[in-house]
């Protein structure tokens, strides 16, 4: 497939900010078009509160006209609680138009000035990597299209995005403790009964956060709400902020007939040298809406995932071994000035072969990851 001119995320390295600098001057939408928030801080200078993030909307897409098989299966009568939980998780798979909105709603410090809100978007296919009785893994792949300067469609850009794993009644979790450190935590059998742990991984498959919660199935929607957890700053924040150290918050995933929604309720937290909370700057609300679409060309993402699936499967396995064997992990952002995601994306690109040597690849991945592990 080398003849194809589809671009992959290794070429742009913007990832969590969803190509903001790449598209900010796109002709798809006027930069002067109003962009609104409900919690808009109306007495603040409008220039200061102009949303940052991607201002383009990309190529037009068509929303799915019906709820589809996944929704029908989820709402079927006679299911056990666990069966319905599983169908709710699997309902997040498929083709979506995604929008991302984040805004600070409350400030807690003297002289507080609200930060500019964040908006962006994407077209994502969520692939089912694993579907087992007690474990489901979902991989997000972005396939983005923009109009070129002459109005013709440009080649799609492919970005391996985040991954979410779901395990039933999981008792071991590595939780974030600030300072790029994750520590093993355990739940009792009683605490884990009937609950699912969602593990969220970065684009390079390194851990981001893990949280336990319980699915609830209402008359016409299903939702999962997490316990409060710590998580590192996402790229949309650490690329522009250095005045706080961790997010403390909860997530809620809600499945609807037209797709699903992820809500975040975060506290932007300053930590002291010992990793304890010293100050909370603000509360942030976030909403990511995934609307099911139809008729979109996902071939670039399909082919990328097919070419690199073996490499990423080995990467997941190497990380799983670290998480199984180590009580504490400290992961550096960079090694010799190179971010981990950049190194891993380059390895994935160079490993696209039909006869991948799994043992050699495993050793190479382990050696690469070791460069980013802090032994101190």
Residue ranges and their predicted role:
Residues 130-176:
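Extended amphipathic alpha-helical segments with heptad-repeat/coiled-coil character used for oligomerization
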Residues 90-94, 128-134, 252-260, 292-297:
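A short, structured loop/turn motif at beta-sheet edges
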Residues 2-10:
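Bacterial N-terminal signal peptides that target proteins for export
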Residues 27-91, 104-109, 114-116, 134-137, ...:
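Amphipathic/hydrophobic helical signal segments and adjacent flexible N-terminal regions
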Residues 97-106, 141-144, 227-237, 263-271:
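Generic short beta-strand segments
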Residues 114-116, 120-130, 139, 248-255, ...:
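Hydrophobic/aromatic beta-strand elements that line small-molecule binding cavities or substrate pockets
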Residues 10-18:
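Bacterial N-terminal signal peptides
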Residues 188-248:
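Short helix-loop boundary/capping segments
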């Amino acid at each position: 497939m080398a003849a194809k001119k589809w671009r992959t995320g290794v070429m742009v390295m913007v990832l969590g900010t969803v190509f903001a600098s790449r598209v900010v001057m796109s002709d798809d939408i006027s930069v002067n078009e109003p962009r609104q928030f409900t919690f808009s801080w109306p007495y603040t200078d409008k220039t200061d509160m102009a949303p940052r993030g991607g201002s383009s909307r990309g190529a037009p897409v068509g929303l799915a006209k019906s709820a589809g098989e996944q929704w029908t299966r989820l709402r079927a009568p006679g299911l056990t609680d666990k069966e319905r939980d599983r169908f709710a998780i699997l309902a997040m798979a498929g083709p979506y138009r995604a929008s991302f909105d984040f805004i600070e709603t409350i400030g807690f410090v003297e002289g507080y000035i609200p930060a500019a809100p964040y908006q962006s978007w994407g077209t994502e296919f969520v692939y089912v990597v694993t579907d087992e009785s007690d474990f489901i893994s979902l991989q997000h792949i972005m396939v983005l299209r923009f109009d070129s300067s002459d109005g013709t469609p440009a080649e799609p850009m492919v970005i391996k995005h985040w991954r979410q794993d779901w395990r039933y009644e999981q008792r071991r979790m590595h939780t974030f403790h600030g300072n790029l450190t994750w520590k093993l935590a355990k739940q009792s059998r009683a605490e884990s009964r009937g609950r699912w742990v969602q593990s969220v991984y970065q684009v390079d498959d390194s851990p981001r956060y893990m949280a336990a919660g319980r699915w609830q199935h209402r008359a016409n929607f299903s939702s999962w709400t997490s316990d409060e957890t710590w998580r590192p700053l996402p790229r949309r924040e650490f690329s522009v902020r250095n005045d706080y150290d961790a997010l403390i918050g909860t997530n809620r995933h809600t499945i609807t007939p037209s797709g699903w929604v992820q809500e975040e309720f975060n506290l932007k937290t300053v930590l002291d040298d010992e990793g304890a909370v010293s100050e909370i700057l603000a509360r942030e609300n976030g909403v990511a809406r995934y609307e099911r679409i139809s008729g979109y060309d996902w071939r670039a993402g399909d082919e990328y995932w097919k070419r690199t699936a073996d490499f990423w499967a080995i990467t997941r396995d190497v990380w799983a071994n670290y998480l199984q064997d180590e009580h504490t992990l400290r992961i550096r952002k960079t090694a010799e000035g190179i971010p981990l995601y950049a190194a891993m994306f380059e390895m994935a690109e160079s490993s696209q072969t039909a006869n991948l040597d799994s043992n050699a690849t495993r050793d190479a991945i382990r050696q690469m990851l070791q460069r980013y592990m802090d032994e101190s």
